Regions:
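Short Gly/Ser/Thr- and Asp/Glu-enriched loop/turn motifs at secondary-structure junctions
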Residues: 111-115, 154-157, 293-297, 342-346
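Short, hydrophobic beta-strand segments
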Residues: 117-122, 311-316, 364-368
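Acidic, metal-coordinating catalytic segment for phosphate/diphosphate chemistry
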Residues: 318-415
Length: 415
């Protein structure tokens, strides 16, 4: 006699964690006396970055919005406390949060500095236990990092993300196959990830105003109006996106790597521009090495004091992740494509046409260029080793010691 055992298909269970008011909350971890007071993280008005980057719940109560000017925010709330951003603190807390997430799953996918998806899918896992995991994470965040986090639990990445948005701060929302139609479908279509202003307008033009409308809309109409993304959104509205959580270590490789900044005063000489490009090139080169990539082209973006912009791009003679080579060709682009008599307000460098270093066979030349490339690479390797051992400021390029160093925030030329 034969016996057949029914094997239950493993349900996908995905957690989305969103650190509440992250920039503003991070500041409270260093100064608890600010708790409960209206607080906004803002750019420095003296350095031409005077907008609100983030705010806490107390500031939100005054109607203060992200990206509005500090002057406007102060008009709404004269007692508003403004502080400068502390990106080293944000990166440190974000990394600490990922450590906590990784103790519950090997699959943790970052979505910006303050959000992560965590794949809890396992034959022994169910939604009740997943909610317990989410609540445990919330408790640990408060105890270990002094941060609050909102969690969404669902069978879909889109719904998990939406769940973390439904209740804030410090809450857990479960969107299951049994309740998603009552919880999600009445919401406006823009509540769904990937529905921005233009997509919302396109959907509204089709008579689609809620997630439920989108879920039940004809696939043909969506495909005609929005192409493949229209069908993708319909699937997402039905919880059928099927997108997996990408392990952070196995994240997709970027198509380009860039670094840019607005100077605290206009750059007026070629030497200052070159120093800035060296600073950007070193940051970009470090990222390229971390990804194991080589760049096939370099680009420069320049903005004048009159906010007139220029974007310049050119292929590189050979694939590289060397900062000196990137800066050299970026500077040549700048000299050939931008008026030398026009000051520079903002500038950036971008490396594109990227290829995995492990798959690339560098072609050799008989005319001496590989010797120079090898020399520059040895210099860069030595600089990185010195910085790793003695700190970022232990060694700098001479070009970065001129007056351009005063045109950017402290620490800009640290590689």
């Amino acid at each position: 006699m034969f016996y057949f055992k029914t094997v239950r298909k493993m349900e996908r269970i995905i957690l989305h964690c969103d650190l509440n008011n992250f920039f503003a909350s991070a500041a409270l971890t260093k100064n608890v006396t600010l708790k409960g007071l209206p607080l906004a993280v803002c750019g420095d008005t003296k350095k031409r970055h005077g907008i609100v980057l983030a705010k806490n719940e107390a500031a939100k109560a005054y109607g203060i919005q992200t990206a509005e000017t500090v002057w406007s925010a102060k008009a709404k709330c004269p007692e508003l406390i403004t502080i400068l951003p502390d990106f080293e603190l944000y990166e440190s807390l974000s990394a600490a949060a990922r450590v906590i997430y990784s103790q519950y799953s090997e699959k943790v996918e970052c979505f910006g500095i303050d959000e992560c998806w965590v794949d809890l899918s396992d034959p022994a896992m169910n939604f009740k236990r997943a909610v317990q995991v989410a609540n445990d994470i919330r408790r640990r965040m408060k105890r270990e990092l002094r941060l609050t986090v909102s969690c969404g639990v669902s069978f879909s990445k889109y719904f998990a993300k939406l769940g973390s948005d439904l209740k804030k701060p410090d809450a857990t929302t479960c969107i299951s196959r049994e309740n998603y139609k009552s919880l999600v479908w009445p919401l406006p279509c823009e509540a769904l990830l990937m529905v921005g202003r233009k997509t919302k307008q396109a959907l509204n033009g089709l008579g689609i105003f809620t997630v439920g409308d989108l879920a039940n809309a004809p696939k043909e109409a969506l495909s005609t109006r929005l192409g493949v993304n229209g069908v993708k959104l319909k699937n997402a509205a039905n919880g059928a996106d099927g997108e997996s959580v990408t392990d952070y270590k196995n994240r997709p490789l970027p198509k380009s790597v860039s670094s840019s900044a607005t100077a605290e005063r206009d750059l007026t000489t070629p030497a200052e521009v070159y120093a800035a490009l060296i600073g950007f090139a070193e940051k970009v080169a470090v990222q390229l090495r971390q990804y194991g990539l080589l760049a096939g082209s370099v680009g420069v973006t320049v903005v004048s004091p009159a906010f007139e912009g220029a974007e310049l791009t050119a292929p590189l003679p050979e694939l590289t992740n060397n900062s000196a080579i990137l800066a050299k060709h970026a500077f040549a682009l700048f000299k050939n494509g931008y008026s030398q008599s026009t000051p520079v307000r903002a500038i950036g460098l971008r490396a594109a046409n990227l290829s995995p270093e492990s798959l690339v066979q560098r072609q050799l030349s008989l005319f001496g260029e590989p010797v120079e490339t090898e020399r520059l690479q040895k210099i860069e390797d030595s600089m990185l080793k010195i910085r790793e051992k003695y700190g970022e400021q232990a060694i700098m390029r001479a070009a970065c010691l001129n007056s351009a160093a005063k045109a950017f925030s402290p620490g800009f030329f640290k590689g």
